[in-house]
């Protein structure tokens, strides 16, 4: 399992727009064949900070995600909504095991 954790810091006055832009990416992502999870989380202490937890069956599926129209459109639209570049960390999922 290939997991990516993305931190996104949104401009205070762009929160509602961010939610709508990211909702479309979320809805497209959860329909992808290799997607296991695509969670959008909001920091309870910093309301302008979001974390995206993406789990795919393997790195190839994660890379395929980055070529989808919903992902590319989201990345383009995020540029005017975020206060700093996105931060990404990749992980190898150990549990649960994929069978």
From Swiss-Prot:
Per its record, the protein catalyses: (2S)-2-hydroxy-3,4-dioxopentyl phosphate = 3-hydroxy-2,4-dioxopentyl phosphate
Question: Where do the TM regions start and end?
Answer: none
* Subcellular location as annotated: Cytoplasm
Record keywords, A-Z: Cytoplasm, Isomerase
Single GO molecular-function term? oxidoreductase activity
Q: Is Isomerase there in the keyword field?
A: yes
Give residue ranges for domain ABM. 2-91
Cytoplasm in keyword set: yes
Give the CC-aspect GO terms. cytosol
EC number(s) for this protein?
Answer: 5.3.1.32
SUPFAM superfamilies (UniProt xref): Dimeric alpha+beta barrel (SSF54909)
Its predominant location is cytoplasm
PANTHER family, alphabetized: (4S)-4-HYDROXY-5-PHOSPHONOOXYPENTANE-2,3-DIONE ISOMERASE, QUINOL MONOOXYGENASE YGIN-RELATED
Quote the NCBIfam families the UniProt record gives: PRK10486.1 (NF007791)
This protein's assembly is summarised as: Homodimer.
**Family from the record:** Belongs to the LsrG family.
For this entry, the protein name equals (4S)-4-hydroxy-5-phosphonooxypentane-2,3-dione isomerase
Q: Which organism is it from?
A: Photorhabdus laumondii subsp. laumondii (strain DSM 15139 / CIP 105565 / TT01)
Corresponding gene?
lsrG
């Amino acid at each position: 399992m290939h997991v990516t954790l993305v931190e996104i810091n949104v401009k205070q006055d762009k929160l509602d727009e961010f939610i709508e832009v990211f909702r479309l990416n979320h809805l497209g992502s959860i329909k992808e064949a290799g997607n296991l999870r695509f969670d959008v989380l909001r920091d309870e202490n910093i309301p302008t900070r979001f974390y995206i937890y993406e789990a795919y069956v393997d790195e190839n599926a994660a890379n395929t995600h980055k070529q989808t129209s919903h992902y590319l459109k989201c990345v383009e639209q995020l540029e005017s909504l975020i206060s700093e570049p996105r931060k990404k960390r990749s992980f190898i999922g150990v549990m649960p095991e994929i069978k």
